[in-house]
């Protein structure tokens, strides 16, 4: 028998937990309403409702991590799925998305393939963000090489940040909607390039 414990008319969305101390795991990012009920030893019950905001922090790094070479006509990408919720009526709205990419400015094993025509070994990676319809929403290509020093960045690294505001996930002619977005590390240079780390942060309050 299915029991609608939270009284919302849906018997499949209850995550009821009982006890003085409970663990609520495997929760997708977003906004949730918690209905708390407390019963004392005399059987008297009281309750309250609170909002809980679940954000997400994803960090990827590996000493051997690299992206294959590409070019401007056929860039190489490493893609990450990024579900985003913006539901104004339900009050479940993303506040912002923060993407941070760190990579070495020059790889130790790089060889300049076009000697005499500048330093081909100077790395340049970018972050791209695509909405559910695979439309390109934003990228970091216009960030100059000497401006890639976000946060506590080592002198030998580039540290690149891309911020996506909540407005970008609304439904207008000039915005891109919510849903199943994809973010990508993007390489248009012919050389393989090492990657130090990539971070995705979804802020829900």
How should these model regions be labeled?
Residues 5, 22-32:
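Residue-level recognition of secondary-structure-to-loop junctions
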Residues 11-19:
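Short beta-strand segments within Ig-like beta-sandwich modules, predominantly Fibronectin type-III
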Residues 22, 44-55, 198-202:
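C-terminal edge beta-strand
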Residues 36-38:
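Hydrophobic/tyrosine-rich beta-strand signature of extracellular beta-sandwich/beta-rich modules
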Residues 42, 58, 115-134, 171-205:
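C-terminal edge strands of extracellular/lumenal beta-sandwich accessory domains
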Residues 54-77:
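Low-complexity, Pro/Ser/Thr- and charge-rich linker/hinge segments at domain boundaries
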Residues 72-150:
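Acidic, Ser/Thr/Pro-rich low-complexity intrinsically disordered segments
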Residues 94-95, 147-192:
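Noncatalytic modules at the cell exterior or secretory-pathway interfaces
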């Amino acid at each position: 028998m299915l029991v609608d414990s939270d009284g919302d008319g849906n018997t499949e969305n209850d995550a009821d937990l009982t006890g003085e101390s409970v663990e609520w795991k495997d929760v997708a990012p977003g906004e949730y309403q918690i209905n708390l009920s407390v019963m004392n030893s005399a059987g008297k019950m009281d309750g309250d409702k609170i909002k809980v905001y679940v954000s997400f922090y994803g960090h990827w790094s590996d000493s051997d991590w690299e992206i294959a070479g590409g070019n401007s006509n056929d860039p190489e990408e490493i893609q990450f799925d990024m579900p985003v919720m913006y539901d104004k009526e339900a009050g479940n709205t993303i506040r912002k998305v923060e993407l941070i990419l760190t990579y070495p400015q020059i790889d130790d094993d790089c060889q300049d393939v076009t000697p005499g025509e500048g330093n081909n070994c100077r790395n340049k990676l970018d972050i791209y963000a695509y909405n559910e319809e695979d439309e390109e929403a934003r990228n970091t290509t216009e960030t100059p090489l000497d401006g890639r020093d976000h946060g506590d960045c080592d002198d030998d690294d580039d540290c690149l940040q891309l911020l996506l505001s909540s407005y970008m996930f609304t439904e207008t002619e000039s915005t891109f909607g919510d849903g199943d977005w994809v973010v990508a590390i993007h390489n248009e240079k012919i050389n393989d390039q090492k990657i130090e780390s990539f971070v995705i942060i979804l802020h829900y309050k």
